[in-house]
């Protein structure tokens, strides 16, 4: 059985669309949800099978492409499409 996994990412408002397009380009690895556009907070929901790949993509965007994408929280999906609730 597949388990869902999520990342809460701090970005800039102007980087959200690019992050979304990159994740979408890798069809099926995750779904991007904007939590707070003005604050630049997005949530990427993936699976345990793809979590390492998604983490690598996010870190690569942050380090090599001038995109602010800092993972502030990650773990098993808590069941919300909009925010990573504790």
Regions found by a protein language model. Give the residues of each.
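Short glycine-/aliphatic-rich beta-strand segments at the starts of folded cytosolic domains
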Residues: 1-11
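A generic structural signal for short, non-catalytic loop/turn and secondary-structure boundary residues
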Residues: 2, 25, 37, 62-64
